[in-house]
């Protein structure tokens, strides 16, 4: 199960959205 990789990718996108 590659949940960690997905979580990292989602976390990066969420951080980008919060920065704006």
Curated annotation (Swiss-Prot):
Question: Its GO CC terms?
Answer: extracellular region
Which GO molecular function terms does the record list? toxin activity
Q: Quote any Pfam family the record assigns.
A: Cu
Residue list for modification Glutamic acid 1-amide: 20
Keywords recorded for this protein, A-Z: Amidation, Oxidation, Secreted, Toxin
A GO biological process of this protein is: defense response to bacterium
Found in which tissues? Answer: Expressed by the venom gland.
Q: Does the keyword Secreted apply?
A: yes
UniProt cross-references to InterPro entries, sorted A to Z: Cupiennin (IPR035164)
Its principal location?
secreted
Report the sequence similarity comment from the record: Belongs to the cationic peptide 04 (cupiennin) family. 03 subfamily.
Statement: the UniProt record of this protein carries the keyword Secreted: yes
* Name of protein: Short cationic peptide-3a
Q: Where, subcellularly, is it found?
A: Secreted
């Amino acid at each position: 199960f590659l949940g960690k990789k997905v979580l990292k990718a989602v976390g990066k996108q969420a951080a980008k959205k919060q920065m704006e």
